[in-house]
């Protein structure tokens, strides 16, 4: 078996020319209590913890060779057990995705799946017990290495543990779909493999891994390996026994799979195949036939690797992990000015959320102002209440809570609050005259070096700054709601914004842990412009006569986080109307103002739906307001029209240099609108579906980018 596996991996290694190779170093230890000699395999790519350990073919070959060694030692009675652990802070984080996206043939993809299985399953076939010590971050194939071992321990300090493959467009393909449900039951496995993945790749902490039954013991991070080896000795001597509950293979298993399908349907609406392939394997894993399950994982892995959703997923992953850290067009960071105090104009909900964010991330004095004391007190009170919540959840200690509360204050007099502020952001009513007045008042009292930022969602930065003595220090700083969750920050350069203001804005964004994208001062910037064109076409077809349900269902195959009209409700119909009016003034040939939306806003409705049954149903009062024509389109016709409009708008935005490249459009939609990885944002999907060429005459991305190489 070993020779066959070695040959398989040697052939596959040629497909991964740039693999960062992980070593599998074997050392021998004398276990405590005279338990015997023990072989410990450490997975290490030779780099620090910022470069996590991964598995490509050469890395798997190294692990295979290490298993050859310990297999021989076990057979000869030289060792009593084998352990696997990782380098400091990292256990292993799965397959080498850089190599995966280079694969061009189904048989090559199949070989990668088989190679991992052939190596990992040898751990469970050794003549001595095997142990996995999850000392640090473990994801994907890293988790699966441990699942093939007989016993597992986990560190309380472990920051991230997941099987994230479905999130990317794959299945856990080296044992996860088969071994995990057979270890902890189908329902818990569905939570880890499906629910967590589709919930923005939710990670587990060490304690949760233990409580789920994935790990058999939980130890402190400071002496994790030492305690794990003591526990190992106790297991081998029979002083400690691991008792695992029986797995329910009856109706509960089928119910768990059905729950997983419900979750997948609600998240991706059948648009991405990965979750459904994983659920099929989990369903069949009920039989306990491990090899049949491994074979199914191999096939699913190969099929998905050769599909567009995975390529888009890897592209999206790279945007979020790499491009987001090196924003296109950002000026020299050395030009940034220090920020030691922040001012916030306004004390409403958005302003209060911003104050809390600046306070938590920068830990500098933050002062709010508003038009009356009651509003100021309410804003400061909101921040204090949120700090108390963090304290209650154990996220901060009492000393830090007291310190943060002491750093936030509120005043009515801008001169008193802002005379020594370095960065002042306004979050007042979305009306150009109001914002111009606010900036005029702030400029009169703020120090000369202070940056003036606006959280406007659609108004012109240049116009806002046009009446100031120093418009060069005004910058757009557009957050997305909810501020604490959505990572995008559109940094908008006005016509006169200078590099120092821009560099300071990018520096602050980094400290806020936001994904900053440089945007030209164009109406509605990026996300709101695309979403308004998208939702505007939905509203247009409804106005023309297509039933609301048909229009909504037409875009379900995209697998968006929510339907257009549910999103409108979240944003607020009044805000949606305001943005559409702004864009209509700028581009009347493409952006309309829906009379039905205007009627909904005038009637004071919060949206198109009521939720009496728990599900969205068209509000009868809204239905009575709708005035529709007699043009009824099919779902396919609606979908084509909407996607063509989006593609046309993106092409125009790129021609106008609103952002540097299509990649920035995609990064904005992923991080600002929550559009899914399987779309790659949107341009990979538009290319894959032929929409780009149909609507604009050419692709957005080069062939092979976010797609299978030719």
What are these regions (language model features)?
Residues 2-36, 44, 66, 70, ...:
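N-terminal glycine-rich phosphate-binding loop for ADP-containing cofactors
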Residues 34-61, 88:
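STAS-typified acidic loop motif
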Residues 55-79:
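A short, well-ordered alpha-helical element
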Residues 63, 75, 88-102, 108, ...:
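Amphipathic alpha-helical interaction surfaces in cytosolic regulatory modules
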Residues 120-132:
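Conserved catalytic cysteine-centered active-site region
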Residues 132-142:
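Gly/Ser-rich catalytic serine loop of serine hydrolases
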